[in-house]
């Protein structure tokens, strides 16, 4: 049983719905007509996407230079009576890595501002054992305090925070970032390693009350494979390479005969959960392990998960609903194809990137700079979440990583 808990907070949304806080109104693009057309100019498009992230990062900062960008804005998440501002650490990690990909001085400054916030919430967690939580309130950070909005500690989230901190250490040489990454990794190893129930790997994390999530997720183990491999390179400690191999072997065990990769296990930690089949398990298995065997998963994706919604074409989030495009997935599918470099892959990747640029310009609730999460409101993930056509930092960051050809699961070689 695998959940997409790093991307959204369905429990928060359900509570808000029950309280009558969500309205059906949508907010139109505030300044789209004033933004230059970047659909035919990839460099301009990238520059505008970074401008979107810059504005989000600078919106919520404290007096010590720590900043935390809200994850979603506009449309479903912004109505006349309610504004959803939580910041998901998965999105924050992607933004950090996207900034290091371009690497301008202001990019590194903003990446450090987010990274310092991640260290701040880690150091000030109520339990204080190296964990971070799913999401935090940026208004709290602005006031110099930690306000947890998503209290779960999910393994995939931890690995993404770790990869962001590892990337910051690689970019800046500041030891505090590597120390924070190692703390995260030790939490993962201590609390989620499963070497009893084959296939061995890492379980889903913990709920707020300390209840362990005993299923194992392909996506989470892919995250760990990438993160622990980075730690092995940065620390020189081969134990992290050994642990990365455990996670990678779990992912291998989830690959079906037709090439696709299943989502993980049921509660027994061994029985394969075959529904739904998510896009992440296909693309991230390739990016996170670097294993050519998952090229078959990319081919399966192209055959089974591509959606067309009006002028937009690209992957959906899973096989549950292939009527809408998930632009975050367009980003990591484009990056996977670009890095694989097989016959026709470059053209396919560019087509996906062109679709994102079109959404950047024309999508409902867009601003001409950032990228919305989906082509239409209400995309069903199959895991109990709905996704909406609202501006999203994580989607925008994946676009920038794909445009740069920068794999967040691996450290840069330059």
Which residues does each PLM region occupy?
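Non-membrane alpha-helical segments in proteins
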Residues: 84, 91-101, 113-117, 160-164
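C-terminal region of N-terminal signal peptides and the immediate post-cleavage residues
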Residues: 21-40
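Alpha-helical support elements that line or immediately flank enzyme active sites
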Residues: 96-105, 111, 282-283, 337, ...
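Tandem alpha-helical RNA-recognition repeat domains
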Residues: 100, 166, 170, 229-233
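Aromatic-anchored glycine-rich loop motif in surface-exposed flexible loops
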Residues: 149, 170-171
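Extended ligand-binding clefts on enzyme/binding-domain cores
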Residues: 37-77, 86-90, 120-146, 152-156, ...
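N-terminal export and membrane-targeting signals
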Residues: 2-16
């Amino acid at each position: 049983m695998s959940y997409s808990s790093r991307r959204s907070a369905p429990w928060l949304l359900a509570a808000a719905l029950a309280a009558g806080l969500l309205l059906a109104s949508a907010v139109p693009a505030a300044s789209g007509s004033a933004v230059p057309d970047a659909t035919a100019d990839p460099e301009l498009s990238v520059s505008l996407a970074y401008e979107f992230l810059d504005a989000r990062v600078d919106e919520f900062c404290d007096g010590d230079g720590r900043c935390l960008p809200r994850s979603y804005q506009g449309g479903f998440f912004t109505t006349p009576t309610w504004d959803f501002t939580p910041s998901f650490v998965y999105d924050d990690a992607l933004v950090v890595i996207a900034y290091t990909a371009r690497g301008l001085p202001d990019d590194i400054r903003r990446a450090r501002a987010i990274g310092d916030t991640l260290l701040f919430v880690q150091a000030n967690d109520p339990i204080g054992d190296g964990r971070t939580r799913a999401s935090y309130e940026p208004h709290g950070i602005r006031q110099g305090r930690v306000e947890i909005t998503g209290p779960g500690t999910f393994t995939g989230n931890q690995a993404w925070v770790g990869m962001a901190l590892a990337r910051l250490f690689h970019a800046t040489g500041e030891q505090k970032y590597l120390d924070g990454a190692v703390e995260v990794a030790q939490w993962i190893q201590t609390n989620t390693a499963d070497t009893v129930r084959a296939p061995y790997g890492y379980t889903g994390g913990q709920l707020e009350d300390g209840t362990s999530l005993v299923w194992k997720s392909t996506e989470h183990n892919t995250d760990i494979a990438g993160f622990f491999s980075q730690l092995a390179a940065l620390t020189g400690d081969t134990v992290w390479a050994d642990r990365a191999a455990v996670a990678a072997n779990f992912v291998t065990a989830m690959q079906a005969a037709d090439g696709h990769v299943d989502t993980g296990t049921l509660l027994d930690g061994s029985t394969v959960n075959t529904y739904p089949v998510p896009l992440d398990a296909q693309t991230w298995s390739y990016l996170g392990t670097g294993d050519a065997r998952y090229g078959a998963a990319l081919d399966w994706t192209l055959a089974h998960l591509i959606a067309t919604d009006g002028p937009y074409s690209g992957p959906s989030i899973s096989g549950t609903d292939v009527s809408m495009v998930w632009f975050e997935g367009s980003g990591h599918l484009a990056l996977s194809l670009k890095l694989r470099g097989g016959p026709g892959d470059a053209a396919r990747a560019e087509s996906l990137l062109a679709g994102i640029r079109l959404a950047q310009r024309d999508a409902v609730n867009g601003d001409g700079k950032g990228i919305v999460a989906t082509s239409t409101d209400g995309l069903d993930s199959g895991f109990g979440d709905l996704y909406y056509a609202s501006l999203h930092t994580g989607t925008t960051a994946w676009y920038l990583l794909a445009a740069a050809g920068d794999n967040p699961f691996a450290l840069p070689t330059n």
